[in-house]
Amino acid sequence: MITGKTLITGVIGHPIEHSFSPPMHNNAYKLMNMDYKYVPFHVEVENLKHVITSAKTLNIKGLNVTIPHKTTIIPYLDEIDETAEKIGAVNTINFKDGIAKGYNTDGIGAIVSIEKYTSLKDKNIMIIGAGGASKAITFTLLNKNINQLIVANRSKDNAQKLITNLKNQTNFENIDFINIKKTDNVIDDVDIIINTTPIGMYPKDEVAPPIKTDKISSKHTVMDIIYNPLETQLLKQSKKQGATTIPGTHMLINQGIKAFEIFTGKTPSYESFEKPLLKHLQG
């Protein structure tokens, strides 16, 4: 039941109809007996400038930010977390004492997911793709004492921009580029593989994985940030080769849990987010 005491959080995006965040957050609120509701808000690009002022006026406590607003929302914020500023994208906004502060929980969501299965310390990691998700994850990775980062991408220019940016912001130098078609040459030297491209996403989930998988083995941990389908072709083939695989639902859940903590100061259980997500994905 919604009353005058109910606190509102939500997510802004365009489109927003297919967001999985509302069922996850609302289920956690219910299980934790918290008088909160999480609402999806459809915000078109031309109306973005009004969001922060409107949220403050309506006493909204927090907002997640999804496509296409993660970068364009930044000029309207009062403050931005150091990590989000370096990544150049915001996916979470907290409102407190009239201040709208932006955060990015995508990177930490990925890191928590990987560390559930393996340590990152001294590992050689290959990340596939050089877009926004790759930037969020790689920046966070470089603070985890890894040994080497390899960026596999079709476009060398885009990868090089990412690499230069990472080196400038972290002073981590052991970062290399490889063409996505030549990853076979380095698979044996890599411990962890992360796909951040949309290759394999529904409805094109039967296409070949972004890299060849015949050299993947039991020594590898492979994560795909795609969560629909639950198991991409990359994960299916890697599992057949003996690798430990991590589906994209893990990152989606863990970044959401971090946002929940920012909004409320409380930590929901992993299961409270996982159950409604799987229900919607499988339903």
From Swiss-Prot:
Natural source organism: Methanosphaera stadtmanae (strain ATCC 43021 / DSM 3091 / JCM 11832 / MCB-3)
Enzyme class: oxidoreductase
Name of the protein in question: Shikimate dehydrogenase (NADP(+))
Domain of life of the native organism: Archaea
Keywords assigned: Amino-acid biosynthesis, Aromatic amino acid biosynthesis, NADP, Oxidoreductase
Binding site for shikimate: S19, F20, S21, T66, N91, D106, Y227
Statement: the UniProt record of this protein carries the keyword NADP: yes
Record family assignment: Belongs to the shikimate dehydrogenase family.
Subunit structure of this chain's protein: Homodimer.
Cross-referenced NCBIfam families: aroE, PRK00258.2-2, PRK00258.3-3
GO molecular function: NADP binding; shikimate 3-dehydrogenase (NADP+) activity
